[in-house]
């Protein structure tokens, strides 16, 4: 039994002002990568909260608040199918991860440099793919 047509139909999401748009593979991949990036960012923020005290903990709380906002932003495309929301979330997280890579480089930590840089690069490729498919 071929589930692809049924899956495509189930993934049709309304976009205000744009009618219905099918969730393409490019949209799905970009949305997954963006969501993973947001979850990882929030995870690191939560670890920082739990492992720090006083002023450092306060700063970690601010970082977690911003990470949580990005998580919410990255969930909107799943609920609406909006390419615009997805691109906004993806571009924001690309910048955040690239800046995190810069911080990791400054600290001299390869994992904190290459991990975020890799996620940022994968998200960037997914965004370009989505933009090519959507045009």
Locate the predicted segments by residue.
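Hydrophobic alpha-helical segments of small multi-pass membrane proteins
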Residues: 90-101, 116-127
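Juxtamembrane boundary at the C-terminal end of a transmembrane helix
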Residues: 126-135
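Hydrophobic transmembrane alpha-helical segments in integral membrane proteins
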Residues: 21-39
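Membrane-helix boundary connector in multi-pass membrane proteins
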Residues: 80-83, 87-89, 99-115, 135
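Core segments of alpha-helical transmembrane spans in multipass integral membrane proteins
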Residues: 34-46, 57-79, 91-99
């Amino acid at each position: 039994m071929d589930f692809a047509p049924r899956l495509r139909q189930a993934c049709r999401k309304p976009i205000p002002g744009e009618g219905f748009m099918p969730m393409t593979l490019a949209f799905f991949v970009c949305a997954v990568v963006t969501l993973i990036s947001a979850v990882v960012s929030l995870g690191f923020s939560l670890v920082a909260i739990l492992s720090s005290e006083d002023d450092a903990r306060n700063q970690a709380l601010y970082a977690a608040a911003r990470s949580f906002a990005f998580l919410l932003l990255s969930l909107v495309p799943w609920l609406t199918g909006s390419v615009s929301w997805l691109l906004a979330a993806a571009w924001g997280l690309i910048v955040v991860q690239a800046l995190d890579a810069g911080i990791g480089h400054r600290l001299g930590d390869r994992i904190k440099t290459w991990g975020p840089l890799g996620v940022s690069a994968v998200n960037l490729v997914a965004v370009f793919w989505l933009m090519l498919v959507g045009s």
